[in-house]
Amino acid sequence: MNSILSDLVKVIGMERDALLTYASYRLGNRSDAEDVLQDCYLRLHERFTDGQEGAKLNIRNYVFRSLSNLCTDRLADRTRHLTVDLGQQDVVETDTDNRESEYYRITSMLDRIPEEQAEVIRLRMYGNRSFAEISNILQVPLPTVKSRFLYGIEKIRKAMKPRA
């Protein structure tokens, strides 16, 4: 096993929960997140076993960036194949429903701000990434990452304030 592949295995082992949480918030459900995460692992494994190595590659950031790209692709596929469930029934709200309601509220707020800002917030809050790591993942300057986070949070706060 080459060194980059062994590094990939270590990163996947250490970051699995953070990657799954991040993908779950991007995609809206754990099942799709697990599928995308598995696809990401397989693609990266194939890439690195084919001898495509990068001497100065930061594996952790590369994995997050690859996962982010696959989530974006999955979301784009969803909008092309959007279906509507006409058989929904009203049910009594449970704790799971409360968590789902909170999830949809957060997702709705993130959908109202520019994608660049929402992506930084997701990586910071659900991916547990530092601003420096996010800068590397998104390949943008550190001050840009910080300003996107700040402006995104400010827009969310304004949206949450009750209107007088």
What positions do the PLM features span?
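A short, charge-rich alpha-helical start-of-domain segment used by transcription regulators
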Residues: 1-21, 25, 34, 118
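Sigma70-family region 2
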Residues: 2, 39-58, 77-78
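Internal acidic/polar
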Residues: 80-110
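Residues within helix-turn-helix
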Residues: 31, 132, 143
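A short pre-motif secondary-structure segment
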Residues: 120-124
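Arg/Lys-rich amphipathic alpha helix in sigma70-family domain 2
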Residues: 64-84, 151
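DNA-recognition helix of helix-turn-helix
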Residues: 138-164
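Structural recognition of an alpha-helix C-terminal capping motif at a helix-to-coil junction
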Residues: 21, 35-42, 57-69
